[in-house]
């Protein structure tokens, strides 16, 4: 049996992969690890304490905030602010980016963007949820307050990205641009242990993930692609299997392991799409590309899009290389 490696050991071991290695990024990832453990503990008590359900307020997107959304947001912010690597965060749950103004954070080199609890509306029915994070080097001068430009960087500028999935087991999956690795939380040890090394997605899959309840509102190209997935064509393993949980992290994680495509296109009610470029699409795209897949808005690479606002939305197609290319073909041939 190979020797078990913890997340902390793995981070230190890989520190030399960074051209500007100083230990800062390693410490930042350790902060995320700590916050994930705290949130995981609370999620596991969600049915026993008064932390499920809505709080009666909406976030900047007009979505009802859940108690655990705010709890996770506070815990991740606190963990990141407590060390000197991060000068500010932008969160799906915050209207504006938050600058850390303590003396401790004055010379910080990084900003973090996050969806602190993706799929939180599923908590009450015990469906897996997750945290998504994205890390950039700031572009404003170190020693000054962070600016909007620090957060509005294209995805190809990310130095690290990852997600935590809180499910039957809790996993942290991340990349720093040198492959994708997954760590499973061992509650008996209180630590994450390397369980999925060098994760790669197959070029072809048999799963397509989309909310087909919105079918009538989809672009023609997406409708035709869904029909393509359902056709009986044994020569290329069709029909595909439809699997949709409604939690981005959960659907993405399954497809990453098994091969498949996740689709969240534009609709008549959301012509720009519904998923957020900065908090969801860019970090997931970075992970997918590092695992050998593709992430697209249907016409261009997700990580080439230059953001114009913090809560910008985009259509999102991510997964096995050949499957994403195929849906792009359908969209190109069937422009509404």
Swiss-Prot record:
It holds the Pfam family FBPase. PROSITE patterns: FBPASE. Binds 2 magnesium ions per subunit. It is found in: Cytoplasm. One of its GO terms (molecular function) is fructose 1,6-bisphosphate 1-phosphatase activity. Mg(2+) 1 binds at residues 92, 115, 117. This is Fructose-1,6-bisphosphatase class 1. It comes from Vibrio atlanticus (strain LGP32). The gene is fbp.
